[in-house]
Amino acid sequence: MLFSKLFAPTLKEPPKDAVLKSHKHLAQAGYIYQVGSGIYNFLPLAKKVLDKIENITHKRMQEHGAQNILMSFVVLASLWEKSGRLDKYGKELLVFKDRKDNDFVLSPTLEENITEIAANFIKSYKQLPVHLYQIHTKFRDEIRPRFGLVRAREFIMKDGYSFHEDAESLDKEFLNTQSAYKEILSDLGLDFRIVEADSGAIGGSKSREFVVLTECGEDTIVVCQNCDYAANIEIAKRSKRPEPLNVPKAQLAKFPTPNTTSAQSVAEFFKTEPYFVLKALVKKVIHKDKETLACFFVRGDDNLEETKALNALNIIGANALELREANEEDLNHAGLIAGFIGPYGLKKHVSYIIFDEDLKEGDCLIAGANEKDFHAVGVDLKGFENLVYADIVQIKESDHCPNCQGALKYHKSLEVGHIFKLGQGYAKSLKASFLDKNGKEQFFEMGCYGIGISRLLSAILEQKSDDLGCVWTKNTAPFDVVIVVSNWKDEAQKKLAFEVYERLLQKGVDALLDDRDARFGAKMRDFELIGERLALIVGKQALESKEFECIKRANLEKQTLKDTELEEKILEMLASE
């Protein structure tokens, strides 16, 4: 490829609204062009990288037995009604009408679509298992699109679905796909982790995320420093904590505690640890057609993890869509006083009460007395009936691993893949069934598997690039080598550059010849910005001594290559990371 023919509209400066280096570099280097909020055009350089990512993905998925299909981007809203997700998914789901007043959605995920295909065409256990996948455009109407391709509204996704006759078969395919994803991300040269995760709006009994470690990541994962335990902070667990020694011994009584509203101040007032204080957190619960209040109790030195709290509500049948902060007006309307909320008589004030599981059989506790400036001491939860307990706390770095007691540590990460065991939920709601070996009708066991193809462009750059521009991995760079001529007006340099270019092409090297009549410094700046893996300099040194300066983009390390071994050395360098 000649640079003069390459459509790569580089910019002098990155977009002013770009925060992440991946967004800055992709826009400035001419990879992407923004159409609207969270919507991007992929220009030739980006398309080359996308094609490489997609080819690796196709190869690994098909090696593991998955079959490639292409489903409609537009889906009937009635299918989403049947699954119950039309309302549950929220405003991120874009719904529209056609000219005949039929309702459709632009699909962010395709569980409904693929389940309908299975319901119509898979009739017998003899056709199972089957794993179908696609790489296609998706749309999610994000409320705050940001960070370029990391949180875009329109994006490219690899999503797959598997159908099984029983849970055992699903378990095998879940692990099979996990292996395929590990191979894909390894081929892409990424440092990643597999973590236990929440299933979110997709649902299911078990899910794992594939996350790339990067300080710009939107997610926090909790990783054990001693074993392989890793989980998204939204579902991370810990081992049982030892109880502090200074237990506040007291009979149940009410004490005046003026202006003492935080767990820390209550603990200091009673000369004990926040561990023994019941911290009450009241949230507004958003349902499909109403709003209610829920109160969550955790120990005073813990914080609420809202994803866990929302899941706990739905386990007890709340059908909650989201949680929001309850403001002072909400509390006043419910007859509650911030800072003095406790379990006694609370049921008449809120619709749901959930205690963290660490409080089971808790005694010697201090709690709000549901009266201004008063707390109750000597609270014993064993004296209450029908309390609901669940894991609802956010793990701290001072906590210990639930598997080995090792130290837990936070890492910032960016999710690039997710696999789910969906079970029979979608099959039942969409009446997708088959006949088993006994001739009885059974619902499919389903798995769901996704990789963010376009997000991977950003993930690679966030992990690998530097302040100068793009640094790609071995299998993702848009070009292997760019040949940079020191003085394009020197006919001898120009002639040698074309000769070297042809030699590299014959060896299968994806080479770019910078044939522009531009300053040498400007050409090298574009090399740093675009991120070809190597830059080969053709100048006076090459003409006079038959030696070429070669620069690795990854670390800007320089090497001198003799003309007689040029192709051999370049192939060696390209074969290494």
From Swiss-Prot:
<keyword id="KW-0648">Protein biosynthesis</keyword>
<dbReference type="InterPro" id="IPR044140">
    <property type="entry name" value="ProRS_anticodon_short"/>
</dbReference>
<dbReference type="GO" id="GO:0004827">
    <property type="term" value="F:proline-tRNA ligase activity"/>
</dbReference>
<keyword id="KW-0030">Aminoacyl-tRNA synthetase</keyword>
<keyword id="KW-0436">Ligase</keyword>
<dbReference type="GO" id="GO:0005829">
    <property type="term" value="C:cytosol"/>
</dbReference>
<keyword id="KW-0547">Nucleotide-binding</keyword>
<dbReference type="InterPro" id="IPR036621">
    <property type="entry name" value="Anticodon-bd_dom_sf"/>
</dbReference>
<dbReference type="GO" id="GO:0006433">
    <property type="term" value="P:prolyl-tRNA aminoacylation"/>
</dbReference>
<keyword id="KW-0963">Cytoplasm</keyword>
<comment type="similarity">
    <text>Belongs to the class-II aminoacyl-tRNA synthetase family. ProS type 1 subfamily.</text>
</comment>
<dbReference type="InterPro" id="IPR006195">
    <property type="entry name" value="aa-tRNA-synth_II"/>
</dbReference>
<dbReference type="InterPro" id="IPR050062">
    <property type="entry name" value="Pro-tRNA_synthetase"/>
</dbReference>
<keyword id="KW-0067">ATP-binding</keyword>
<dbReference type="GO" id="GO:0005524">
    <property type="term" value="F:ATP binding"/>
</dbReference>
<dbReference type="InterPro" id="IPR002314">
    <property type="entry name" value="aa-tRNA-synt_IIb"/>
</dbReference>
<dbReference type="GO" id="GO:0002161">
    <property type="term" value="F:aminoacyl-tRNA deacylase activity"/>
</dbReference>
<dbReference type="InterPro" id="IPR036754">
    <property type="entry name" value="YbaK/aa-tRNA-synt-asso_dom_sf"/>
</dbReference>
<dbReference type="InterPro" id="IPR004154">
    <property type="entry name" value="Anticodon-bd"/>
</dbReference>
<dbReference type="InterPro" id="IPR045864">
    <property type="entry name" value="aa-tRNA-synth_II/BPL/LPL"/>
</dbReference>
<dbReference type="InterPro" id="IPR023717">
    <property type="entry name" value="Pro-tRNA-Synthase_IIa_type1"/>
</dbReference>
<comment type="function">
    <text>Catalyzes the attachment of proline to tRNA(Pro) in a two-step reaction: proline is first activated by ATP to form Pro-AMP and then transferred to the acceptor end of tRNA(Pro). As ProRS can inadvertently accommodate and process non-cognate amino acids such as alanine and cysteine, to avoid such errors it has two additional distinct editing activities against alanine. One activity is designated as 'pretransfer' editing and involves the tRNA(Pro)-independent hydrolysis of activated Ala-AMP.</text>
</comment>
<protein>
    <recommendedName>
        <fullName>Proline--tRNA ligase</fullName>
        <ecNumber>6.1.1.15</ecNumber>
    </recommendedName>
</protein>
<dbReference type="Pfam" id="PF00587">
    <property type="entry name" value="tRNA-synt_2b"/>
</dbReference>
<dbReference type="InterPro" id="IPR002316">
    <property type="entry name" value="Pro-tRNA-ligase_IIa"/>
</dbReference>
<dbReference type="InterPro" id="IPR033730">
    <property type="entry name" value="ProRS_core_prok"/>
</dbReference>
<dbReference type="Pfam" id="PF04073">
    <property type="entry name" value="tRNA_edit"/>
</dbReference>
<dbReference type="InterPro" id="IPR007214">
    <property type="entry name" value="YbaK/aa-tRNA-synth-assoc-dom"/>
</dbReference>
<dbReference type="Pfam" id="PF03129">
    <property type="entry name" value="HGTP_anticodon"/>
</dbReference>
<comment type="subunit">
    <text>Homodimer.</text>
</comment>
<dbReference type="InterPro" id="IPR004500">
    <property type="entry name" value="Pro-tRNA-synth_IIa_bac-type"/>
</dbReference>
